[in-house]
Design a protein with these regions (language model features):
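A short, Trp-centered hydrophobic/proline-enriched beta-strand micro-motif
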Residues: 11-27, 65-69
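A short, well-structured catalytic beta-strand-centered motif of the EAL phosphodiesterase domain
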Residues: 35-39
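Short active-site oxyanion
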Residues: 42-46
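Short, structured beta-strand-loop surface elements
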Residues: 54-122, 128
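Ferredoxin-type iron-sulfur electron-transfer modules and their immediate structural context
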Residues: 113-115, 120, 124-165, 169, ...
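Iron-sulfur cluster-binding cysteine motifs and their immediate structural context
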Residues: 161-178, 189-206
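Solvent-exposed segments in extracellular or luminal domains encompassing
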Residues: 181-184
Length: 213
């Protein structure tokens, strides 16, 4: 069976394990903390928290979370989307697969914990460990991802200024010139320097395209 990119990226987050989970507090300000990725099944990511924590209240109130992790190869996974409280049915399995949890919540104290599932949203793989850099947007669940960055339109005059300015050499000669989206930093140098104003921001159109490996 072919494995989708999303499944691979979720498994990478599980291997990173201790990653940053971000939410919005009741006063509208951001909050971030390190949380363990407890379980990954296909395109579903599971984590847990205690019912008395602010994190729990923020998840229940907003229904959204953003997650960021970095590994030793300078590869970042970012995901954001909807979360759902799935109760305590998975607690036993989570404690089996994460035995250190027994030291933090021994015995019956585990039942203050509730499990959440991130199952619908967007994400991006981004690697600074390669030259040029690599990025890959993806979506999971019923969601689509929004195109970001820049593109060169047909009003391109072929001067090559954008290609010379690009710090990752991610722009190929042509008519018009073409930005290799998988290698683009999204820095905006080409957008700023184009004398013909032929470079535009990608307008957020959605896409479901995703490679399988």
């Amino acid at each position: 069976m072919t494995e989708r990119k999303t499944e691979i990226y979720f498994k990478m987050l599980r291997e990173m394990r201790d990653v940053v989970f971000s939410t919005v507090a009741a006063d509208g300000t951001p909050r971030a903390r390190i949380i363990d990725v407890m379980l990954v099944e296909g395109e579903k990511l599971y984590f847990l928290t205690a019912a008395g924590k602010d994190f729990y209240e923020e998840l229940m109130r907003t229904g959204f979370v953003a997650v960021t992790g970095l590994n030793s190869n300078w590869e970042t996974i970012r995901v954001w989307g909807k979360v759902r409280n799935v109760g305590q049915d998975l607690l036993g399995r989570i404690f089996e697969e994460n035995p250190s949890m027994n030291n933090v919540y021994p015995g019956e104290s585990r039942y203050i914990l509730e499990v959440f599932c991130l199952e619908e949203g967007e994400g991006e793989f981004f690697s600074l460990g390669t030259e040029p850099i690599k990025r890959h947007p993806f979506s999971f669940g019923k969601n689509t991802y929004r195109k970001k960055g820049f593109e060169i339109t047909d009003t391109c005059i072929g001067c090559g200024i954008c290609a010379s300015a690009c710090p990752q050499q991610a722009i190929d000669e042509g008519s018009p010139y073409v930005i290799r989206q998988e290698n683009c930093l999204h820095c905006g140098l080409c957008f700023r320097d184009c004398p013909a104003e032929a470079i535009i921001r990608r307008n957020g159109e959605t896409d479901r395209e995703e490679e399988a490996v």
